[in-house]
Amino acid sequence: YFEARNNEDYEAVIALESRAGTYGTNSDGSFHKPKSISSVEQWQRFNQGGVTNVFYPEAIQLSEDVVFVRLYAEGMVTAGGQASDYRTRVTMNWVKEDGKWVVKTQHYSPASYGGVHRTQKADFEE
């Protein structure tokens, strides 16, 4: 999904999203978004550009057709001609539709790494 977004392959992005629509929350602090059915044109118009790299992805199967995913995303994004660094925590729910895994929900929250919480040794212990 993120590879398709980085490559601006919006047809692949759309194919990996639920045809019934997705629910999302952006990392900009705005309110939760209503159900959205994306189009290639929307992605072309609103994608920020740049490259986002995925770190520490985890997938936890909640049921036969629901998987919870969490990861960190970091990279550089471009908006209005200005490039800036991007760090966020991501949680997603993937569901099986017609035998294919697709994104149903996405929640992005800013990761300032030290703004609220200072990393401790215990953060990395099992």
Please identify what each model-predicted range represents.
Residues 1-9:
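Short, aromatic-enriched amphipathic alpha-helices that serve as compact interaction elements
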Residues 37-84:
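Surface-exposed, charged secondary-structure patches
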Residues 16-32, 42-49:
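A short gly/proline-enriched turn/hairpin at secondary-structure junctions
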Residues 6, 75-79, 94:
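Beta-strand elements of well-folded, non-transmembrane domains
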Residues 17, 27-28, 71-75, 90-92, ...:
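A mature extracytoplasmic/lumenal domain signature
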Residues 32, 76-79, 111-115:
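A short local loop/turn or secondary-structure capping micro-motif enriched for an aromatic residue
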Residues 87-118:
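Short beta-strand edge/turn micro-motifs at domain boundaries
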